[in-house]
Every structure is written in C-alpha cells, then in structure tokens.
C-alpha cells in the first residue's frame, strides 16, 4: 500500500540567510584573530568617523570586539573641529601656519580642556556603553608623552634669510614612556589617549594626533597603526586606491607628486612608524562603517597598507 509522504524540509529552512552569512564571516575571521591575538593595534581616531554619531557607535563596538578577541587596542584621538568651535565660542582667534594651529597660552588651555576633557570622555563613554572598559588619559598622565616645542623654519626669498616661526605651545614627542599602557595589556582596559604632551618644565603642549599615534605605535612595536581619515587611502594618478605600498614606493610617489597635500604628513607618519618597528601602518577610510574590522579581519582591508621595503 502506497502512502503519500511529505517532501523533505529544506536544509536550514528556519535559519535566516543573513545569519548564515554572519556565521561564515566569523569563521573566515578566525585566522586573523589568531594572527593578532595578544598584539597591539594603535588606532588614530578622528575626522568623519568621530563626528558622525552612528559611525562613532560603530567604532566603539569595533574597538570592544578587538579587545574581546584578545587584541590590545590603543585609541589616540584628534579634535580639531571641536577645538575650533570652542575657540570661536570664547572669541579666541585662531591662526594656522603650515596647517598647524598657533597655540598661545590661552589657546593651549582650551585645547587641553576640549581634547582631554570633553572629547576624551565622550569616546570613553561610547566604548563603555558598547560593553568595553575604557580609561581616558592624556599624554601628561604618567608622563606618557614627553614633548618639546616644535620649531618650524621658513626661507624668505626676498632677504634670503631663514626665519624661525613661533607656533607657541605646539609640541612634538621626544620620549614616549609606555609603562602606564603596559599595565593595561593583560587587563580588560582600553586606553583612550588625548594628544597632549608635557614639557621638561611641566609645560602643556598641543601635539598633532597623527604624530602622537605614530610615536606611540613605534614605541610599543605595534602590529598595526591604523590612521582613520576622510579619504579612501592613497590614490594613484588615475584616482584609484592603492591597496599596498612599500616604504620605498611611498617615497617615490611622494617625489613624483602622486602623494600630495594633506596626504603627505599622514604617509610620512606611517613611514616613520614602520621604520621604527611597527609591522605595518594603514591609512583607513574612516567613513566606511566597521572600517577597523574590515582592515584587521579581511584580506582586502579598507585602505592603503604601508610596510617595510623588502
């Protein structure tokens, strides 16, 4: 006697396709989790990624994930637009030389207040809200970033004299003392650092966030320095993304003029960090959601990777 039997149920009938895709993505990330477990990832955080509320939340979750899977993320943040708005509110005029904010005594107090106060604590709060345990620091804490006054010179073609430009309390790192950060390596703590340096006599110095991140990454021999920016990365002459560069190739592109404008100091920071022991530095498009995870956990990445010449 024949009986009708119900057709077999399709495999995964009750599992949404999106979940299967997420599971596959997690599985593919496993080799990268092993590769970077226990290693330091320094992230320079700024630009659109920091100014957009949704991207800020995404960034915080991504940093927490890095810590949860065994990496040691260190966040160094900027805050130029926020500083500018506060100076405008206080009616303190800003002047720039070669893209650097001239920082007098009144301005440096505002810079420290905005960077080490409001911005730093906002990032810490965002990371903690995402389930992490972030602690805010400035370069003054534990004498983490010891700095000196930056000296800039400019040649005057009319007089043929090289003039020294006074940038005020704009500094450059001379010593990075990472002992405070080393204490956090084997803990759940994620350090978030404002780029404020301390001088030999206790002065406060305003330090470019890219420069501070590069110096910290070099001192800690980080596996990666990620520089979040508002561009795709380094572009070739046809405006196409260059996914990877050697230090030598990066220097050549700079000489040829392919790397120009605001990209020059970022590439120079990456080159300096790599030559001082960072395994690779990456200029990452911070406008892309989950750009940090894409860079660490996928073969293609999310920007331009610069590594030592072979």
Curated annotation (Swiss-Prot):
GO MF annotation, one: ATP binding
Binding-site residues, substrate: 79-80, 101, 206
EC number(s) stated in the UniProt entry for this protein: 2.7.2.8
Positions bearing the site annotation: Transition state stabilizer: 44, 266
Pathway participation: Amino-acid biosynthesis; L-arginine biosynthesis; N(2)-acetyl-L-ornithine from L-glutamate: step 2/4
Subcellular location, principal: cytoplasm
CDD domains attached to this UniProt entry: AAK_NAGK-C (cd04250)
GO cellular component terms, semicolon-separated: cytoplasm
Subcellular location(s) per record: Cytoplasm
SUPFAM superfamilies xref list: Carbamate kinase-like (SSF53633)
Keyword hit for Amino-acid biosynthesis: yes
Reactions this protein catalyses: N-acetyl-L-glutamate + ATP = N-acetyl-L-glutamyl 5-phosphate + ADP
GO term, biological process aspect, one: arginine biosynthetic process via ornithine
Keywords attached to this entry: Amino-acid biosynthesis, Arginine biosynthesis, ATP-binding, Cytoplasm, Kinase, Nucleotide-binding, Transferase
HAMAP family: ArgB (MF_00082)
NCBIfam families according to UniProt: argB
Protein family: Belongs to the acetylglutamate kinase family. ArgB subfamily.
Free-text function comment from the UniProt entry: Catalyzes the ATP-dependent phosphorylation of N-acetyl-L-glutamate.
Name the record gives this protein: Acetylglutamate kinase
Top-level taxonomy: Bacteria, Pseudomonadati, Pseudomonadota, Alphaproteobacteria, Rhodospirillales
């Amino acid at each position: 006697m024949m009986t009708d039997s119900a057709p077999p149920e399709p495999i995964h009938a009750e599992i949404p396709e999106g979940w299967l895709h997420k599971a596959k993505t997690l599985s593919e990330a496993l080799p990268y989790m092993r590769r970077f477990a226990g290693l330091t990832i320094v992230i320079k955080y700024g630009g659109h990624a920091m100014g957009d509320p949704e991207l800020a939340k995404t960034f915080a979750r991504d940093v927490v994930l890095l810590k949860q899977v065994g990496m040691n993320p260190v966040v160094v943040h900027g805050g130029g637009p926020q500083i500018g708005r506060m100076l405008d509110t206080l009616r303190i005029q800003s002047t720039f030389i070669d893209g650097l904010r001239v920082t007098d005594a009144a301005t440096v107090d505002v810079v420290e207040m905005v960077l080490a106060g409001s911005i730093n604590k906002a990032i810490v709060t965002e990371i903690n809200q995402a389930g992490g345990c972030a602690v805010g620091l400035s370069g003054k804490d534990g004498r983490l970033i010891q700095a000196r006054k930056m000296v800039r010179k400019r040649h005057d073609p009319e007089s043929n004299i090289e003039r020294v430009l006074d940038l005020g309390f704009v500094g450059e790192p001379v010593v990075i003392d990472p002992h405070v950060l080393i204490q956090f390596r084997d803990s759940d703590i994620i350090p978030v650092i404002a780029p404020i340096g301390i001088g030999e006599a206790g002065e406060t110095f305003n330090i470019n966030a890219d420069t501070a991140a590069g110096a910290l990454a070099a001192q800690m021999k980080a596996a990666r320095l990620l520089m979040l920016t508002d561009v795709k990365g380094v572009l070739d002459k046809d405006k196409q993304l260059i996914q990877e560069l050697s230090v030598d190739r990066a220097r050549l592109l700079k000489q040829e003029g392919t790397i120009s404008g605001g990209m020059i100091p970022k590439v120079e920071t990456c080159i300096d960090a790599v030559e001082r022991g960072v395994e690779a530095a990456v200029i990452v498009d911070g406008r892309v959601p989950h750009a940090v995870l894409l860079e660490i956990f996928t073969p293609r990445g999310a920007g331009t990777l610069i590594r030592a010449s072979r």
